[in-house]
Amino acid sequence: DYPDSKIAVLEKESRLALHQTGRNSGVIHAGVYYTPGSLKARFCREGNQATKAFCKKHKIPFRETGKLLVATNHAELGRMQDLLERCRQNEIPTEVLSQQQLQDKEPNIVGLGAIWVTTTGIVDFAKITHTLADLFIAAGGHLFTNCLVTGLSESHGATVTTSIGRFSAKFVVGCAGLHSDRLIRMLGQEPEFRILPFRGEYFQVPVEKRGIVNHPIYPIPNPELPFLGIHLTPMSDGSLTVGPNATLALAREGYTRWAMNLRDMIEMFGYSGLYRLIRKYPGPTLTELKNSLYRPGYLQLAKRYCPQLQLDDLCPYPSGVRAQAVRADGKTLDDFLFVKAQHSLIVGNAPSPAATSALPIARHICDQIKELL
């Protein structure tokens, strides 16, 4: 719609997809968990098909694996029915498996029953990102790396101050992930949330045990908790991962247990929303911390549905950090959030399934820009 416009992408790292986009389970989500009518539900359903179509068009390897959500006790069987109803409302094709049918599909997985989700897939989202960058540059776009944003202001357009100079633009879109609240604050607005970093620790199983499952295996989630639980995921590179957990990190880019950033810690521990969140989930907070420090505890969560896993099967694998948006009252933001200014739009909250939803999110941003210009 704007063929004469110039577009630049400012990337603070030396290359793309080094953080949340490149450090995740690689799952093309179907949209099982999300509140009907929410942006997450809509964009995930659209993104599932759009991501696969993009991969096919540009010859990016992916697999349509499907996914099993396994109930290991009667409480989870009950929650399974609620999840099935949500799938129905979100128009997600599913099949209910009995204990025997689950055993037939996955001989090494135990459970009382399962939900079979047919449209889930596996891909390397970093490869999608690099393909998008190549297409962007080929279309005349400009990509600046090692370009840390240090200021953002508005007056007759937007001015972005960076480590390599200043950029002026008619409109700015901020997709800063773990630093989204800081971008909003640069505009002079006080965000309704703060980003709290939760490290997701993964393990991979040895090569000889990679065939222990054929599909992604997830537990039935507890709707009272903000995370999905530890799962098994056959990755696009052939590895099989166990995880992630969700433990508070001491740095927004803290990928190791003792990685610390003083600024991040001051902002986090000075935020009332952190303590209200912990008070809301005291048991899970302590359990996640314990399992991060004590591998046998981590293992037990996976052994509930995959008893063949042993402690020696948990081999090192890179961690990720999830940008969790939390309000001052301790409540987590459940849906995608976009914060508008006169000449700017900041993606404020974009946790999972944002990678799956990336193409619909991009279309939504373009539509918002058209309205604002």
Question: At which residue positions do the language-model features occur?
Answer:
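Glycine-rich FAD pyrophosphate-binding loop
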Residues: 2-23
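Proline-centered flexible-loop/turn and helix-kink motifs
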Residues: 3, 56, 107, 307-310
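Dinucleotide-binding Rossmann-like beta1-alpha1 core, especially the glycine-rich loop
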Residues: 27-101, 111, 229-230, 239-241, ...
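Short beta-strand to alpha-helix junction loop
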Residues: 35-46, 70-80, 115-135, 144, ...
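A short coil-to-beta-strand element that immediately follows conserved catalytic motifs
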Residues: 62-65, 192-198, 309-318
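Helical element adjacent to the flavin cofactor pocket in flavoenzyme catalytic cores
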Residues: 115-171, 175-182, 357-370
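Flavin-dependent oxidoreductases
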Residues: 152-261
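C-terminal catalytic lobe of FAD-dependent flavoproteins
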Residues: 257-259, 263, 268-373
